[in-house]
Amino acid sequence: MTTVTRFAPSPTGYIHVGNLRTALMNWAIARKSGGTFILRLDDTDRERSKQEYSDGIMEDLEWLGLTWDRLERQSDRLDRYAEAADELRRAGRFYECFESPTELDLKRKKLLNMGKPPVYDRAALKLSDEERARLREERGGYWRFLLDQERIEWTDGILGPISIDAASVSDPVLIRADGQVLYTFASSVDDIDMGVTFIVRGGDHVTNTATQIQIMQALGGTPPSFAHHSLLTGAQGEALSKRLGTLSLRDLRARGVEPMALLSLMARLGSSQPVELFRTHEELLAGFDVGTFGAAPTKFDAEDLFPLTRHYVQGLPFEAVRGRIAALGVPDDLAEPFWRVAKDNIGVLEDLGGWWTLFSEGAEPQIDPEDEDFIRQAMTLLPPPPYGPESWAQFTAAVKEATGRKGKGLFMPLRKALTGQAHGPDMSEVMPLLQKVRAKG
């Protein structure tokens, strides 16, 4: 049987690190097994779903290289959901309810005050036909799925054996009074129709899974296998949900995080395997195993992405960055030497721009007060550009002879005057790249 997985984001916002884990795991399972990966946009929320978010989701996945085999939109399948709803009505598994949100809230509070679980009391099932007709005229009705009150069990790919008593769960609302088909229902119909065989999603969906198993069975479908991964927390264990707006993929991308650095962290975070940098998707897939992930909340710190990014970019061959370097305006004959000098001194590729500005426009000199006279004298001994591989040795030898300085007292002030930095690349490699020197004699 072909493995079919899906990633089903709602286009009500951009992808963040939390749902990236879901996307990556489902993609990896499909790719590793030679199966099919579906991108399904769960866009039935007409008010909140935006085309810009749909486009953004696809752009982010393409940036990461998480390509899909099929694209589906729930908004194209509304007629199918209506058919499935009729099927459930005929089977006696779909019933209309009329309570207002306020009335439901009062019921919940009453049950909680009595020390009972806030499970819907199925009062709507006791209404007569006349009462239903009267209520329909007063307010719109919404629809619930009638759960069989038995234990719902499955073996989870991460959590292990799961058993949930359906009597402890409210009959789920599947269609709102305004006609909007809700996630629990549309997703169940889609997963059956699209032949989905394996679903990985967050641990906050476990109860949803229990109800969806019954919905799928009521529609004559075979539920897929499920695995529920842990939820992410902040670095100190705090809830991450309020911070997800600052952890969208496009925000991390804007900060210079590389796709493979992000995927490498997410492919191992929360698993029994150590995080390591993968340079290709093939390397990542070779070491991926959903069974190595645990149930405990997983700490995520965005700062962990930057050592991985630095390691990744510093290992790139020149050909991989040739276009970016050319776009900076680096002359062709200096492009490869520039990369060789700059690569070990950058954290993200965007740092290259700062290095080329330094080389092409000159650095603001950093001169300690006690070195001012020394630098003025030294600069009189430095000829104008261009410089060659021997220029640094020749310059420092001349300054040493003229001033008597040597060692750190000679080299450090000169480096700071020419580059504005106390540390950096070997000056013998820097000099041939310097187009301008701003320190004056």
From Swiss-Prot:
Keywords: Aminoacyl-tRNA synthetase, ATP-binding, Cytoplasm, Ligase, Nucleotide-binding, Protein biosynthesis
PROSITE patterns: AA_TRNA_LIGASE_I
Superkingdom field: Bacteria
One GO cellular component, as annotated: cytoplasm
EC number: 6.1.1.17
Principal location: cytoplasm
One example of a Gene Ontology biological process annotation: glutamyl-tRNA aminoacylation
Gene Ontology MF term list: ATP binding; glutamate-tRNA ligase activity; tRNA binding
Residues binding ATP: K242
UniProt motif 'KMSKS' region: location: 239-243
Cross-referenced Pfam families: Anticodon_2 (PF19269), tRNA-synt_1c (PF00749)
Extent of the signal sequence: none
Class in the EC hierarchy, top level: ligase
Motif range ('HIGH' region): 9-19
Subcellular location as annotated: Cytoplasm
Catalytic activities: tRNA(Glu) + L-glutamate + ATP = L-glutamyl-tRNA(Glu) + AMP + diphosphate
Family of the protein in this entry: Belongs to the class-I aminoacyl-tRNA synthetase family. Glutamate--tRNA ligase type 1 subfamily.
HAMAP family in alphabetical order: Glu_tRNA_synth_type1
Assembly and interaction partners: Monomer.
Annotated function: Catalyzes the attachment of glutamate to tRNA(Glu) in a two-step reaction: glutamate is first activated by ATP to form Glu-AMP and then transferred to the acceptor end of tRNA(Glu).
The name this protein goes by in its record: Glutamate--tRNA ligase 2
Classification of source organism: Bacteria, Pseudomonadati, Pseudomonadota, Alphaproteobacteria, Rhodobacterales
